[in-house]
Amino acid sequence: EEAKMEFSKYPEKVCFTGNPRAQEVSTVQKKAALEAYNLDSEKPTVLIFGGSRGAKRINDAFVEALPELVTKNYQVLMATGDIHFETIKSQLAKMANGKFNVSVVSYISNMPEVFSTVSLVVSRSGATTLAELTALGLPSVLIPSPYVTNDHQTKNAESLVNKHAALLIKEPELTGNRLVQTLD
């Protein structure tokens, strides 16, 4: 319905069809997908990612939050994007002194399986990601990219925030402290 306002010149041509990817995600059965990332499939898990290529600002906030995140009762799976992976992995390694509740990967190829096992998602607010999250009823913290046409990711995020289905952090307000406070 909200899209009709964006295409107000021809509202009769707007037709709701759904998102085929969202339907695929909704049929995935919960599996022990987290074990592939050395995480406990029985613990609450937060997935953090900034899209397939990663997002520097989200990654920076994650690194800043690491000292706090490793002390939490929940676990974190962080997908950094290929460009940022080695830097962030080395930050985590500097803190290594035992088993962590944080796993860092460059990319998640089995996202439908992972979505079916996590408790909360922190991500950008692209249309396909939000379709997948809403299909599964996953709570989310959305950080819209400020670098997209017509600020559509903010509009996408606000549609869920207005329905009390997500929280929103604007990228300029994102810090490690803000991330941890929001997750807690």
What are these regions (language model features)?
Residues 3-14, 89-90, 95, 114, ...:
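Short loop/helix-cap segments at secondary-structure boundaries that form the rim of catalytic
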